[in-house]
């Protein structure tokens, strides 16, 4: 997993870090878990949600195939289970909320995407939440495929809601987002990021951030979908 090791090792820009913190805070509020509750995260990335949950006095466990990521979570004080998803090597009804940020789109097809949702539903306690955040193919266009080579399952608001129903979950909300933004502002910023000339922006940023850093920030601000469902 050399690509993802390098991806996580590369520093975020100041703007990128601020946007990510704001986005994580917004997702954290959607979890609806009180201090002392338990959160399970699929694909913890750089550990931002792990850190936020532990700071709030919650129990936290992550599942990831990357040993480097699992080690980071343990250093933060959380639990980590190394393995591919799905299935999820977690007990039935063991979490008050299950969170998957930028994970569903990495499933190879709709059957694996459905299996992932079914597994998240299994791990959530009765009345618990499943919170999913994924890019919107309709807004990202070719950038959905270009941003990461492992993107396999096209995610849209409609498709995520359909899987949610088939997994036996009750949708609570399915809102468009762009980084930490929502509503009309998310739509406007997402559209601007899609249409802004990438080469021009990279040239203007030359000497301050790399073209790759700009591209990551740009794709992070394209329209995405934040789905909240209950078991």
Which residues make up each language-model segment?
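Active-site micro-motifs of SAM-dependent methyltransferase domains
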Residues: 87, 105, 109, 139
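Short, glycine-/aromatic-enriched active-site segment of Class I SAM-dependent methyltransferases
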Residues: 131-152
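A short glycine-rich, Lys/Arg-flanked "PGG" loop and its adjoining helix->strand segment in the class I
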Residues: 114-129
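Conserved N-terminal segment of class I S-adenosyl-L-methionine
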Residues: 1-87, 91, 97-101, 117, ...
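A short SAM/SAH-binding and catalytic strip from SAM-dependent methyltransferases
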Residues: 97-111
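A C-terminal cap/extension of S-adenosyl-L-methionine-dependent methyltransferases
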Residues: 176-231
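Short alpha-helix
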Residues: 152-168
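Feature marks short, surface-exposed loop/turn motifs that line or immediately flank catalytic pockets
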Residues: 69, 138-140, 178-180
């Amino acid at each position: 997993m050399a690509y993802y090791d390098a991806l996580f090792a590369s520093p975020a820009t100041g703007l990128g870090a601020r946007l990510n913190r704001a986005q994580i805070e917004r997702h954290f509020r959607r979890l609806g878990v009180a201090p002392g509750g338990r959160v399970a995260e699929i694909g913890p990335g750089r550990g931002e949600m792990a850190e936020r949950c532990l700071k709030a006095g919650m129990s936290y466990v992550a599942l990831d195939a990357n040993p480097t990521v699992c080690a980071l979570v343990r250093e933060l004080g959380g639990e980590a289970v190394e393995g591919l998803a799905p299935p999820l090597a977690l007990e039935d009804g063991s979490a008050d909320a299950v969170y998957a940020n930028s994970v569903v789109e990495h499933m190879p097809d709709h059957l694996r995407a459905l299996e992932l949702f079914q597994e998240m539903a299994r791990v959530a306690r009765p009345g618990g939440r499943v919170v999913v955040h994924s890019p919107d193919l309709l807004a990202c266009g070719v950038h959905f495929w270009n941003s990461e080579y492992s993107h396999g399952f096209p995610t849209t608001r409609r498709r995520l809601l359909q899987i949610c129903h088939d997994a036996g979950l009750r949708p609570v909300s399915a809102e468009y987002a762009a980084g930490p933004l929502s509503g009309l502002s998310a739509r406007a910023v997402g559209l601007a990021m899609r249409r802004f000339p990438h080469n021009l922006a990279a040239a203007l940023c030359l000497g301050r951030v790399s073209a790759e850093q700009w591209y990551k920030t740009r794709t992070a601000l394209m329209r995405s979908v934040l789905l909240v469902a209950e078991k």
